[in-house]
Each structure stands twice: as structure tokens, then as C-alpha cells.
Amino acid sequence: MKAVFDTNILVSAIFWRGSPYRCLLAAQAGLVELYVSPPILAELVRVLQDKFQLSPEWVDEVVGAVRGVARVVEISGTVHVVVDDPSDDKFIETAQMANVEYLVSGDHHLLTYGELGEVRVVTARMFLDILSQSSQ
């Protein structure tokens, strides 16, 4: 199963032990092929530095850990779908470029789409339920 996790899922997985954390554990265990793009990693760096005021060393360690679990795909920045928050377009384009089945998000701007072509936009809890059903 292939997926893209948006930045809020990645940040939640880093700091808390809820559903996003379990999604990241599934990727670490090889149950999920996780994909990111340079703009997603850049946003992760910005959020960790600006919002959480983490040291550059800690940020580098976290981003390195995400890179260790995920495959990085290049995007062009030409997808323009999310009218209410164009900065979310990078997640959709990454999902399309990586040909994933799921975009895991907690962002209502993305979740309202439900499906974008072949990509289903789901919450972390929904993704865990899907993973659980697929392993039975």
C-alpha cells in the first residue's frame, strides 16, 4: 500500500502517540510505502523550526528519519487544485507523481475532496482501519 502523509500527520507522529504515530510505525515496518517530496520536507523543516522552535540539529535528525522511511519524489509545482489553501497542492501532486492510493491528512481543506482521481484522502484513523482490513 502506498501513501503520502501530509505535514500535520508527520508532525503529530513525531510529538504524540496517536493514530498518526501508528501510521508512521506502519511505514517503518514496511506495511506502507511512504512518499514525500522536497516541498513536503521543506514545510516539515519550517514547522519544526518556527512553530516548535526545535534546534537545527534536532530538525535535521527528524527530517533524516523521515527520509529514511520515505521515498522522495520530485514534483514540478504545477498542480493547482486546493482553492482554499494552495499550499496543500504539494501533497496532491506528490500523491499523483508517486501513484499512491492514499493521502493521509488531518487538514479539512484536503479531507473535503474525499477522492482526487485514484487517490483517496483519508484521516489517520481511517487509514489505520484500511490497513487493518487489508491485513486480514
What is the meaning of each model-derived region?
Residues 89, 108-136:
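Acidic, PIN/NYN-like endoribonuclease modules and their adjacent C-terminal/linker elements
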Residues 5, 15-50:
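PIN/NYN-family metal-dependent endoribonuclease catalytic core
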Residues 6-7, 36-37, 106-107, 123-124:
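A secondary-structure boundary/capping signal
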Residues 31-34, 99-101, 118-119:
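Short active-site oxyanion
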Residues 69-102, 108:
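Active-site neighborhoods of divalent-metal-dependent phosphate/nucleic-acid chemistry enzymes
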Residues 18, 35, 57, 61, ...:
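Residues at secondary-structure transition points
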